[in-house]
Design a protein with these regions (language model features):
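Conserved class I S-adenosyl-L-methionine
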Residues: 187-197
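Conserved SAM-binding loop of SAM-dependent methyltransferases across substrates and taxa
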Residues: 198-209
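Class I S-adenosyl-L-methionine
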Residues: 302-344
Length: 344
């Protein structure tokens, strides 16, 4: 059973479907959240009544990176058709060149000049709506940060104010998420992702887990996930339940021994120190089942201007909180720990 705000829920596929997949825990939002005007992919609606949310699919948005733009330009040298992807590699389609414009899908088209511009920009992703080409980037007046999708060799990375939220040096976001999950395999039972981001770990965990709950505090990050084709299982997979809210406020409401695995990939210590606090670690220990595992990403020692070895500090704090078998994995820059007891 899962307890949230005093309500007892049987957390299984049927209840997940009733819940609609997305929960809102931000008290400032009472009826609906509308994304920034001018190119919104849709509206996530929810009500104060628990379980009153409606799962909505995003509107179809064509996304291109330098990879697809370069492919099309090369193929158009030999004819007026090109096979390419309009969703960052998920699927392929045939597009045609007519009178200096590439007809993509429906009313969407892009000029050759814009296609050449996209091909030269290797660190950005572009959305095409009818004849408009826009870089996928958002500025938040609340956090005063910019949010951007950045192309990689497989799944896009999230960049916040020029700081990458994914590892891409010597790896890719997908391979990195797969490597992390191998540290806590077998991935079974109930999984919690405390800081969802683009949701790659939650998506991969859902392949074998019974259920996955993912928490995301930043509505701008959630917007990036809704735009990202490779994040769509978050909104479509009935095994995955999303909560829009603050993990430090939500997790205390969970019952004891609720989860088999907890993935904790918080922002930097300077941004979210509360997610590294002793009290928060104690709550993570409490909600894990005996033998359950914690996967805590810390990053490389000294990275992003750090003067401390964060992984060593986290290792000490987790041991002090009562975790067992606490150790650091140098390949993924994660600390792995377990709640004492036997895993069922």
């Amino acid at each position: 059973m899962l307890r949230i705000q005093g309500r007892r829920l049987k957390w299984n596929l049927t209840q997940n479907e009733k819940m609609g997949g997305i929960r809102n825990r931000d008290p400032r939002v009472t009826s609906e959240l509308r994304w920034q005007p001018g190119g919104s992919p849709g509206v996530i609606r929810w009500t104060e009544r628990f379980g009153g949310t409606v799962r909505k699919r995003r509107n179809s948005v064509i996304l291109l990176s330098s990879t697809q733009a370069s492919e099309m330009l090369n193929q158009f040298q030999h004819g007026n058709q090109s096979r390419t992807s309009l969703d960052l590699g998920k699927t392929e389609t045939v597009v045609s060149l007519q009178e200096g414009y590439v007809r993509l899908s429906g009313e969407a088209q892009v000029s050759l000049d814009n296609l050449r511009m996209i091909a030269k920009c290797e660190d950005a992703i572009f959305a095409v709506r009818e004849c408009r080409v826009e870089k996928v980037i958002r500025f938040s007046n609340t956090s005063l940060r910019t949010y951007k999708l950045r192309p990689t060799a497989d799944w896009p990375a999230l960049e916040i104010s020029s700081i990458l939220m994914h590892r891409i040096k010597g790896t890719t976001p997908r391979r990195d998420a797969e490597a992390k999950l191998r540290l806590v395999s077998p991935v079974q039972g109930a999984v919690l992702d405390t800081c969802m981001g683009l949701g790659y770990t939650a998506i991969l965990a859902a392949f074998t887990a019974d259920s996955v709950m993912a928490i995301e505090k930043d509505e701008n990050v959630l917007e990036m996930a809704r735009l990202n084709p490779h994040s769509q299982p978050l909104f479509q997979d009935r095994k995955i339940t999303l909560i829009h809210g603050d993990a430090t406020q939500i997790i205390p409401d969970f019952g004891n021994a609720t989860f088999d695995i907890v993935n904790h990939d918080p922002p930097t210590l300077s941004i979210a120190g509360e997610l590294y606090a002793d009290a928060f670690y104690a709550d993570l220990l409490r909600i894990l089942k005996p033998g359950g595992k914690l996967l805590h990403y810390t990053g490389a020692p000294g990275s992003r201007g750090r003067r401390i070895d964060l992984s060593a500090s986290v290792t000490r704090r987790l041991a002090r909180a009562g975790f067992a078998n606490v150790h650091n994995d140098s390949e993924t820059f994660c600390v792995v720990a377990a709640r004492p007891g036997r895993r069922r």
